[in-house]
Amino acid sequence: MVLIRVIANLLILQLSYAQKSSELVIGGDECNINEHPFLAFLYTGWIFCSGTLINKEWVLTVKQCNNRRPMRIYLGMHTRSVPNDDEEIRYPKEMFICPNKKKNDIMLIRLNRPVNNSEHIAPLSLPSNPPSVGSVCRIMGWGTITPSKATYPDVPHCANINLFNYTVCRGAHAGLPVTSRKLCAGVLEGGIDTCSADSGGPLICNGQLQGIVSWRGGSCAQPHKPGLYTKVFDYLPWIQSIIAGSTTATCPP
């Protein structure tokens, strides 16, 4: 397992400067090692993403993190180069997606076997209600910490951002639909944001998983350019149906 980790880290370092397809936290600080027991690191050998453990057997992320390559899922990870004692590796047993990636950027992954809850592994609660505009929410991930040149840290970074009305994002990014199952969040002054390799990571508001890092237009952390996050609350029936074993679960219209 140590040899696998060494090889994986070398590949990540080699590929990090070419990474373009997913969204790290700019303007944040190193996360506390005990702050993110639900945070999953998804690695396919070409790109890496984040995800959120929502129970012992399921991880929630976004569709764009599936590049059809074999995926390893690390739980309980903090420092990429040095495994925690309770760190675990799993593989996808099943992946469930919604059609139309731009409209429904969400993916539910069933792990090949359940993880063990521990000091650094524990699920995050799904939302009981949608988040309120004006909420201060938490973002985190191993994505790039510099917007102009990709610089990927060894430990995840965390930051606080604000939740805005969706119309703010419509005004900031051309071509967005009038209505959307997305949340709009960021810092209008710029300087704090998710970015390359943060895709699939959590937007945490009031201690619950309210959003998933999904999409942005142009460069990260720009003034008046908040990002878009898949609104988890709108997908609760779909998520719960799949976990319950439904083969006919449909995405929200």
Curated annotation (Swiss-Prot):
Disulfide bonds join 31-158, 49-65, 98-251, 137-205, 169-184, 195-220. Pfam families: Trypsin. One of its GO terms (molecular function) is toxin activity. InterPro entries: Peptidase_S1_PA, Peptidase_S1_PA_chymotrypsin, Peptidase_S1A, Trypsin_dom. Residues 25-244 form the Peptidase S1 domain. The keyword Glycoprotein applies. Keywords: Disulfide bond, Glycoprotein, Hemostasis impairing toxin, Secreted, Serine protease homolog, Signal, Toxin. Expressed by the venom gland. The keyword Glycoprotein applies. Its main location: secreted. It comes from the Eukaryota. Glycans are attached at residues 116, 165. Residues 1-18 form the signal peptide. GO terms for cellular component: extracellular region; secretory granule. It is found in: Secreted. Snake venom serine protease homolog that may act in the hemostasis system of the prey. Belongs to the peptidase S1 family. Snake venom subfamily. PANTHER family: KALLIKREIN-1, KALLIKREIN-RELATED. This is Snake venom serine protease homolog HS120. It comes from Bothrops jararaca (Jararaca).
